[in-house]
Amino acid sequence: MKCMVIETFKPGKTDEVYARFYEKGRMLPSGLRYVDSWLSSDRTKCFQLMETDKMELLDKWIANWNDLTDFEVVPVEDSPTKAAQQKMD
């Protein structure tokens, strides 16, 4: 399953987010795959596309970062997959 993870950095914590990232990396548990990410132009939000078969791995990863950022996790499907499923229904 793919998920769009929307991170909203807590006020005044942006520099700490990047300091931790440069020091420790993404800190992903095995089985959670980073696909790509985008940063808002004001550097207050990060949009990360992640993939996993076990949603609980997202909770494990979020626990590494939730002192610095708030999270919203939205399960997503790519358009071609959804279109193919609708044709079969």
Model-found features: residue ranges?
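Short S/T/G/P-rich N-terminal loop/turn motif that feeds into the first structured element of a domain
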Residues: M1-V35, L39-K45, D53-L57, E77-D89
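Conserved short beta-strand edge segments in small beta-sheet-based binding/regulatory domains
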Residues: L68-S79
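Conserved catalytic core of Hanks-type protein kinase domains
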Residues: E51-T52, N64
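Short, electropositive alpha-helical surface patch
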Residues: L58-W65
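N-terminus-centered regions that define maturation/targeting leaders and the start
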Residues: Y18, N66-D67
